[in-house]
């Protein structure tokens, strides 16, 4: 099995606590509201903390598909959230799982700095393709911007 790491960092004008609330605390309800392709997020097993399995149902290419996410860490104090895609349509055939480690911290002018590490755990010595990496980054960036936009459009949130 190979492990391939990718890191990304972005900034937001939204304070870490408000952004974390949208990205983590309320995400199961907010994401289907702000991302048209995502129909639902439901807990299949667990209570929302580490070890919880969530089913994310989405439409891609006119077909309804799903991903299974396993929550690895929820740290509300330090604004950190880690999870892995462990099954479903979001995993390429050459990948066992994709893990995401995210952390928000205070940024300039009351905003946030978001750091993300993505780890592809591949089968054998396969490497993720550039297309898979670019597609995953685009989806992640879109999700982040959609939730950030929701918070900005709803000042009382």
Curated annotation (Swiss-Prot):
Pfam families, per database record: Bet_v_1
GO cellular component: cytoplasm; nucleus
Induction text: Not induced during nodulation. Up-regulated upon pathogen infection.
Cysteines joined through disulfide linkages: none
Expression sites (tissue/organ): Expressed in roots. Detected in nodules and leaves, but not in stems and flowers.
Cytoplasm recorded as keyword: no
UniProt-listed GO biological process terms: abscisic acid-activated signaling pathway; defense response
GO molecular function terms listed in the Swiss-Prot or TrEMBL record: abscisic acid binding; protein phosphatase inhibitor activity; signaling receptor activity
Xref: PANTHER family: OS08G0374000 PROTEIN-RELATED (PTHR31213), STRESS-INDUCED PROTEIN SAM22 (PTHR31213:SF55)
Family per similarity comment: Belongs to the BetVI family.
Name of the protein in its database record: Class-10 pathogenesis-related protein 1
Species of the source: Medicago truncatula
């Amino acid at each position: 099995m190979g492990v391939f790491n990718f890191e990304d960092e972005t900034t937001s004008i939204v304070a870490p606590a408000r952004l974390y609330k949208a990205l983590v605390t309320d995400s199961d309800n907010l994401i289907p509201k702000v991302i048209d392709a995502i129909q639902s997020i439901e807990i299949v097993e667990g209570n929302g903390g580490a070890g919880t399995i969530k089913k994310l149902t989405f439409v891609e290419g006119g077909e309804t598909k799903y991903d299974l996410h396993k929550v690895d860490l929820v740290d509300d104090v330090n604004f950190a959230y880690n999870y892995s895609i462990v099954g479903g349509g979001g995993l390429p055939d050459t990948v066992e799982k994709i893990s995401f480690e995210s952390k928000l911290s205070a940024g300039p002018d009351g905003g946030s700095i978001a750091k993300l590490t993505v780890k592809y755990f591949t089968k054998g010595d396969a490497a993720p393709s550039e297309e898979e990496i670019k597609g995953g980054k685009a989806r992640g960036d879109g999700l982040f911007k959609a939730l950030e936009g929701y918070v900005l459009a709803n000042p009382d949130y």
